[in-house]
Amino acid sequence: LANTQSLSLNAGTGGAIAASSTIGTGTSLATLTVTNSNGATFSGAVTTGTSVVLTDTTDATAITFNGALTTPTLTTAAQGYNLVLNGGATITNAVSFAHTGTLTLGNDAADVLLFDGGLTATDPSGVTLNGTVRTSGDAVSLGDGNTALTLAGTTSIIDTTNNGGTAAGAGITLGGAVDGTLANTQ
């Protein structure tokens, strides 16, 4: 029954969501939705066949994926929560991060986040990169005048050729300030 069942999580504004194991890795879910929470942590890998929808979480609290996130579509609503993708990711369709809290892409140099259709992150209040962001020949736009990019690892990579698989690549736009976290180490 792969891709036929959905899970919607609503802990209200006072309750946290904690998933300590994998979700959808044995048989993928159709959709995972976080309707509301006072923070959500997914410790294991999350796999869906259709989408992951992040509707709302209390402002300045985080929705955190510590395992790999695999989904065709990732949708974030224009709310003030933070989003943390720590375990790598494979997302098929273009992603436009609409949430207005912070965005963290990776927490280790070995993390690889493939946004196969490209990505735009100009609405978050700040973007932190540690690891590799890849696309398969699709554009990447990180930051704007109000959204800085912070490099958290010693080497951060933005690669629109998917490690050479799409030789032509695509444009990379860094629209805001780009800084490291430790002087002379990034």
Where do the protein language model's features map onto the residues?
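Extracellular lectin-like interaction modules
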Residues: 1-186
